[in-house]
UniProtKB/Swiss-Prot annotation:
Residues 123-171, 176-195 are annotated as: Disordered. GO terms for molecular function: DNA-binding transcription factor activity; transcription cis-regulatory region binding. It is found in: Nucleus. Expressed in both vegetative and generative organs. Mostly present in inflorescences, flowers and seedlings, in the transition zone between roots and the foliar part, and stems, and, to a lower extent, in leaves (in midvein and trichomes). Keywords: DNA-binding, Nucleus, Repeat, Transcription, Transcription regulation. Induction: Slightly induced by auxin (IAA) and jasmonic acid (JA). Accumulates upon mechanical stimuli (e.g. wounding) in inflorescence. Down-regulated by sulfur-deficient stress. Residues 37-61, 89-112 bind DNA. One of its GO terms (cellular component) is nucleus. InterPro entries: Homeodomain-like_sf, Myb_dom, Myb_TF_plants, SANT/Myb. This is Transcription factor MYB76.
Amino acid sequence: MSKRPYCIGEGLKKGAWTTEEDKKLISYIHDHGEGGWRDIPEKAGLKRCGKSCRLRWTNYLKPDIKRGEFSYEEEQIIIMLHASRGNKWSVIARHLPKRTDNEVKNYWNTHLKKRLIDDGIDPVTHKPLASSNPNPVEPMKFDFQKKSNQDEHSSQSSSTTPASLPLSSNLNSVKSKISSGETQIESGHVSCKKRFGRSSSTSRLLNKVAARASSIGNILSTSIEGTLRSPASSSGLPDSFSQSYEYMIDNKEDLGTSIDLNIPEYDFPQFLEQLINDDDENENIVGPEQDLLMSDFPSTFVDEDDILGDITSWSTYLLDHPNFMYESDQDSDEKNFL
DNA sequence: AACAGTCTCAACCGCCTCGAG
DNA sequence: TCTCGAGGCGGTTGAGACTGT
């Protein structure tokens, strides 16, 4: 073997990087490009291991890294993706242009996790905490605006307002199924233990749909009740996701400024229908007539790393099969979920 | 002003996967 | 086919900043 270890050596420096070291690393990568991290320290004149150089570059020095406060849209994306994917920081970071996995991870651990707990939501399962909410079906409120309000109105906290959004029966049935343990959420991953009496491929797809059902439940219950700002300014939000906002905004006045929306009734099927109608004008749409289960579903629609793009597809399925979560689990030996 | 407690986040640690040899 | 190192990733640490008393 000609390979040499790239992180072993005498007198390697650890700890915080100095400005001088940063300059050397930036200068070297500017001239020679990324890669070959094993050799970079020696060639750049740094007493660091290659791995340390790579981390310093990818997490801090890289020119296209966005730093500073996370926007509301970014926060919502993080929460939604965390609900469905768990601590997959690199996957989440891919949906947030110019954000690093390390930054997303830190932001989650220091800000979002605490706020979810404050609002009575388990940051691991994304379900209401049992101790704070005796009714597991009733969505808890996550107030996206609290952070900005805290400075100005520290004595006011809308999180004390009771959750006021009764979800439709369809969504409630899905959420209650999830809450009752028929789907199991482990370490933030939604893993549907309900076994469907179908072929392996369709079973996997159903479980994908189930996973998305839980995330849409979370995002809707939190987004509708929280304060949303116009999605038009958001960057990187897929169209279908933006449309869900637009629909809500079209139907609820002052959504962008109200904290407690107090929506008396929200018709989830109607929302999905609207979503589909909106999408009919676009390309690459799976219409209600298309059987998501039996077709060779294009892989682009079930890309696990692009779940936001799947909303149209699985919401269409939910509309057609509102009771899919109740389907028989007989005869299934399916073990490869998701 | 001094101290203690808390928070933040850059950096490190260690495990895993992939691919070169 | 096997070995092993590079690179990727998530978890954890700890120094410095911040806040409260």
